[in-house]
Amino acid sequence: MTKQEKTALNMARFIRSQTLTLLEKLNELDADEQADICESLHDHADELYRSCLARFGDDGENL
């Protein structure tokens, strides 16, 4: 895996993690409409991470 590929994979993993954290916070605030949007965003972030992982290779993290 090249440095650029590793960077892209790390960024995708970070975005996936942050959208999940945001979703938890929105649920705590009972912000249902925003939580629904964030859940969709998290699903896309997870899909992006898995796609990058498949394309660029395994970084040793368990899905």
Swiss-Prot record:
Name the record gives this protein: Regulatory protein rop
InterPro entries: Regulatory_Rop, Rop-like_sf
Highest classification ranks of the organism: Bacteria, Pseudomonadati, Pseudomonadota, Gammaproteobacteria, Enterobacterales
Entry keyword set: Plasmid, Transcription, Transcription regulation
One Pfam family from the record: Rop
GO molecular function: identical protein binding
Task of the protein: Regulates plasmid DNA replication by modulating the initiation of transcription of the primer RNA precursor. Processing of the precursor of the primer, RNAII, is inhibited by hydrogen bonding of RNAII to its complementary sequence in RNAI. ROP increases the affinity of RNAI for RNAII and thus decreases the rate of replication initiation events.
Gene3D superfamilies: 1.10.287.230
Species of origin: Escherichia coli
Key word Transcription present: yes
Entry keyword Cell division: no
Subunit structure and binding partners: Antiparallel homodimer.
